Amino acid sequence: MSRGLRSPFVALGLAVALAVTAGCVGEAPSGGAASGDTIKVGVLHSLSGTMAISEVTVRDAELLAIEEINAAGGVLGKKLEPVVEDGASDWPTFAEKAQKLISQDRVATVFGGWTSASRKAMLPVFERNRALLWYPVQYEGLESSPYIFYTGATTNQQIVPGLDYLREQGKKKVFLVGSDYVFPRTANKIIKAYAAANGMEIVGEEYTPLGHTEYSTVVNKLGQARPDAVFNTLNGDSNVAFFKALRGAGITADAMPTVSVSVAEEEVAGIGPDNIAGHLVAWNYYQTTPGAANQTFVAAFKARYGANKVTSDPMEAGYNAVKLWAAAVAKAGTTETEAVKAAAKGIALDLPEGTVTIDGENQHVFKTARIGLVQPDGQIREVWNSGQPIKPDPYLKGYSWATGLS
């Protein structure tokens, strides 16, 4: 088994041990060093391994935001200097590289991660060093660290609206398919609680390791269970194999629609639009989202990386993270961690998905939920939205059916 595909439980244990060891050699100063003509910032994503299909373009979007900030004069009169590291789809590596960025490179903040396993591996590193991580991807909720800002959706801004949409469409029998690590298992625990309270039935639940590419057995079980819909929490390039297997088995989106929460435009391109057109996704941003800020973002991304490139929700959330951090630093007048945290509370910016506001109570952001339908050209057409940004509720305190989940 490759290093990137270790058991998530073993990997997380190793990551915590590494973080403890790193912490014993001394803590970095809070907020990093901003001496000289530049301010160093860390960019930490999987540039290799099974998660590279998703994370490389998040890095690209964050670097674009850094370039735009520098072109406008920088922050506090200084240019931003990105220090890019590869988490290699391996959770202990994320912990190691996070510690390096903080203590050796002395960055002011870090933008990074995708999987919840990588985030949980990094969390103790940032908390011990009192340094800030800006995490750009939707996740399962039930977490709120004082040293993480979460610019992707939490559960009540993505998974719950996705379930609401299925229920409103009359889909009562649901089959759960996910990768075998913390996000899908926790998300499905939440989904099962929702289903029990809302007259839905879970007719199957299957997990496969990250990087898994053989889905004939899972697809056969889908055919036998005959659900009204599939809720998909697979991550990385496993989605390519899964949707190809679905199509190969003759299972159509009309007969058995799949709602995915980790498949966006970039993944659609990798899967092949022919294999996924007609299926649903739940996010907060699409390349087709209307608005001048998004038109500018899409044009800038294509100008920087190529006219054939697409934008997606995690990319946009990574881009937003850089802009929000820069606004907080400008407001604070320093890169010092506690000052930036205090300044970030309530900051609102007009960003590609719309107005994004940081909730000072939990360091998540208000986000509009959007359900989309994958089109034959690989773009995603919005078919429903929440009408206004939803206040983040990472512990689902506003839902009686979620009592006892946290």
Regions found by a protein language model. Give the residues of each.
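Periplasmic-binding protein-like
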Residues: 101-113, 134-136, 175-178, 226-236, ...
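Extracytoplasmic "Venus flytrap"
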Residues: 35-61, 85-92, 114-117, 177-185, ...
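Beta-alpha junction/loop-to-helix N-cap segments that form part of ligand/metal-binding clefts
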Residues: 28, 32-33, 53-58, 73-142, ...
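Solvent-exposed, acidic/polar segments of extracytosolic/periplasmic ligand-binding ectodomains
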Residues: 351-406
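Extracellular/periplasmic periplasmic-binding protein-like sensory domains
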Residues: 246-319, 329-333, 385-406
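Signal peptide-proximal N-terminal region
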Residues: 39, 60-82, 196-199
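Short, low-complexity disordered leader/linker segments with a strong preference
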Residues: 1-40, 71, 402-406
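Extracellular/periplasmic Venus flytrap/periplasmic-binding protein
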Residues: 96, 140-141, 146-249, 288-296
